[in-house]
Amino acid sequence: MYKKTIDYDKVSKIYDNVRVGDPEMVTQILQGVSLENDSLVLDVGCGTGNNTILFTKATNAKVTGLDISYGMLEKASEKDKQVPLVQSPADTLPFSDETFHFVFMTEVIHHLPGPQSSVYDIFRVLETGGSLCIVTQSHTQIDGRMTSRFFPASARVDKERYPDTDVIEGFMLKSGFDRASSKEYQFRPTQLGEEYLNTARNRGYSMLHKISQEEYEQGLYALEAAFASGEKLTYSAGYTFVWGFK
């Protein structure tokens, strides 16, 4: 039941209706890295390019987006045809050794079939002195999600999918990074409204594709009932920024 795979070419058709780039997340990444005008940056698992484009606009660096899904990259290209896009899995990157100054991935590592091999190949394409930032959620942060309240099976599924932050640091050190560290960040509280409800209705969160139909319908019923009752749902998302330094 929890081994369902996700067809991201199909998901791409609704992805931009329910998911947008996150300036606050990109800002936190930028606070941890120093980039020059000609720095080469790689966004691994860029999806429809939301954060790739935000990162490009916020810096003068040359940012490339990479994703395994052609459908996602098609959407990204529609938004900005100037951003280079590459279709490839994350564990066999089609780049020469020591190409990039900085690599980042946002909410991607739990989608990778072989996260250790992907981190190793990222290490290969990073230049000496470069860094990697993996934005993810710890198991504690997963438990604190609003989706975990209404769809409790999704927390169980995601704690199986997400390597915890100490494990990710281990991936980095095993791959050859000189050091690794993690920094937790709590986003500003937001009141959840129709956008959140529509995201759940459209299964815009990937973990909702991995729970049973019965569990999904029960959770959606409870969520819609909470909105109908006038309950104010306020949520402050927690993320962990795991850094590796080469």
Describe the function of each predicted region:
Residues R161-S175:
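Short alpha-helix
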Residues L40-V44, T48-T92:
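Class I SAM-dependent methyltransferase SAM/SAH-binding core
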Residues E107-H111:
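Short catalytic micro-motifs in class I SAM-dependent methyltransferases
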Residues T48, S181-K246:
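Conserved Class I S-adenosyl-L-methionine
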Residues F104:
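A conserved beta-strand element that flanks and buttresses the S-adenosyl-L-methionine
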Residues Q116-T128:
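A short glycine-rich, Lys/Arg-flanked "PGG" loop and its adjoining helix->strand segment in the class I
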Residues M1-E36, N50-L54, M72-K75, S131-R161:
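Conserved class I S-adenosyl-L-methionine
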